């Protein structure tokens, strides 16, 4: 019988005392629940001086923002912990460290990152971290290369694909990215003023064919162990540092999905900046976002190709020029998935603060409309946008 029970703050303290690796566990005396996501309880555990020393995270058996009417598997906690452990192995400087995991309690203890800030909040506040995009590109190159066919023996790769099978969480992604925004659904969430724009998504045959192709690639292309939800709210930043967290959507899928989701969130910030900062002040920040996108992709591509040249184990995949050709396909996928992220965050269940916190209704609606229009263009034109420079030109065109 499972010993699962929902943690209280007292439980979190007792658990951290046992598993957080603190030299003097009795110094841990209090906890505060700080989770602002949709799926989990998250506790900060404090010492006697009020300093946060560890994080205790527990999966809930339902979607928190909906309630018990939307049940979820607790096995996602195992998948998150194992994904983060695997990613830490390949990119320790950019992945949160897991101290302990218990599959029956669906709980993990991880390093405290109180000296970092959530990147999304910093982007909204126009606090610039010039190294962040390059570090994110390096993280993605390291973890995606080292869990791909370029590096893993075929037997090991197939074993890992089975280990990280994540059907319940993938189903959520499939619905929120590729189904809900293109049909009338109770989970969709958008202002009535955008009804005409959203109805146009449902009626666009060319768009829906392109979305179907993206969904099929999400199903069928087990290229590497993805983070699965790598957006600016699942990344912590500090001066000179970046750490990825929240990997419960981890599974083996198309590399372009992680790249596209990351770029998509930078573009969501781009779309929201006029409402956050005012049109005049937003101009420079928007150029920074475009520069971030350029740095993210070029760092990822250069690092991935360098790793491929040095470490590819398969003789056929090591043939000169193949890694470069492979990345062209990854790029096309990334552009399409980027567009789907823009649309689902504008009309679907889960929005982003970059736009939702804009106070002026008319401006907020215009920023949402911009994201929808841009997302649609990127999905439909993905195969023709053949470089990051071409992507940035398209973004400027739709501004």
Curated annotation (Swiss-Prot):
It catalyses: 5-(methylsulfanyl)-D-ribose + ATP = 5-(methylsulfanyl)-alpha-D-ribose 1-phosphate + ADP + H(+). Belongs to the methylthioribose kinase family. Homodimer. Substrate binds at residues 229, 344. It holds the Pfam family APH. It comes from the Bacteria. It is an enzyme of class 2 (transferase). Pathway: Amino-acid biosynthesis; L-methionine biosynthesis via salvage pathway; S-methyl-5-thio-alpha-D-ribose 1-phosphate from S-methyl-5'-thioadenosine (hydrolase route): step 2/2. Catalyzes the phosphorylation of methylthioribose into methylthioribose-1-phosphate. Keywords: Amino-acid biosynthesis, ATP-binding, Kinase, Methionine biosynthesis, Nucleotide-binding, Transferase. This is Methylthioribose kinase. The keyword Ubl conjugation does not apply. One of its GO terms (molecular function) is S-methyl-5-thioribose kinase activity. Its EC number is 2.7.1.100. GO terms for biological process: L-methionine salvage from methylthioadenosine. The lineage of its organism: Bacteria, Pseudomonadati, Pseudomonadota, Gammaproteobacteria, Enterobacterales. ATP binds at residues 40, 57, 111-113, 246-248.
């Amino acid at each position: 019988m499972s010993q699962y029970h929902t943690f209280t703050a007292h439980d979190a303290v007792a658990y951290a005392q046992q598993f957080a690796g603190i030299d003097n566990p009795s110094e841990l005396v209090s906890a505060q629940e700080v989770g602002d996501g949709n799926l989990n309880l998250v506790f900060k555990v404090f010492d006697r001086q009020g300093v946060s020393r560890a994080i205790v995270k527990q999966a809930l058996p339902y979607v928190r923002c909906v309630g018990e009417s939307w049940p979820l598997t607790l096995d996602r906690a195992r998948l998150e912990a194992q994904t983060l452990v695997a990613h830490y192995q390949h990119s320790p400087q950019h992945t949160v460290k897991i101290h302990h995991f218990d599959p029956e309690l669906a709980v993990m203890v991880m390093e405290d990152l109180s000296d970092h800030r959530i990147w999304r909040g910093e982007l909204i506040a126009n606090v610039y971290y010039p190294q962040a995009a390059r570090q994110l590109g390096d993280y993605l190159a390291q973890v995606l290369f080292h869990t791909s066919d370029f590096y893993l023996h075929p037997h090991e790769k197939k074993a890992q694909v089975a280990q990280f099978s994540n059907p319940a969480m993938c189903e959520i992604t499939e619905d929120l990215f590729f189904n809900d925004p293109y049909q009338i659904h109770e989970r969709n969430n958008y202002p009535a003023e955008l009804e005409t724009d959203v109805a146009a998504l449902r009626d666009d045959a060319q768009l829906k064919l392109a979305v179907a192709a993206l969904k099929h690639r999400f199903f069928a292309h087990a290229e590497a162990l993805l983070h699965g939800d790598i957006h600016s709210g699942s990344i912590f930043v500090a001066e000179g540092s970046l750490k990825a967290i929240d990997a419960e959507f981890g599974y083996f899928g198309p590399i372009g999905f992680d790249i596209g989701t990351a770029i998509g969130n930078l573009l969501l910030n781009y779309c929201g900046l006029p409402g956050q900062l005012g049109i005049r002040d937003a101009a420079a920040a928007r150029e920074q976002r475009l520069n971030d996108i350029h740095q993210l992709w070029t760092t990822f591509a250069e690092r991935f190709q360098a790793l491929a040249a040095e470490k590819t184990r398969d003789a056929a995949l090591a043939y000169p020029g193949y890694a470069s050709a492979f990345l062209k396909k990854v790029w096309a996928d990334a552009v399409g998935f980027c567009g789907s992220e823009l649309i689902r965050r504008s009309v679907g269940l889960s929005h982003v603060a970059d736009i939702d916190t804009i106070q002026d209704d008319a401006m907020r609606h215009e920023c949402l409309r911009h994201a929808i229009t841009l997302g649609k263009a990127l999905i439909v034109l993905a195969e023709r946008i053949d470089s990051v420079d071409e992507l940035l030109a398209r973004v400027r065109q739709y501004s």
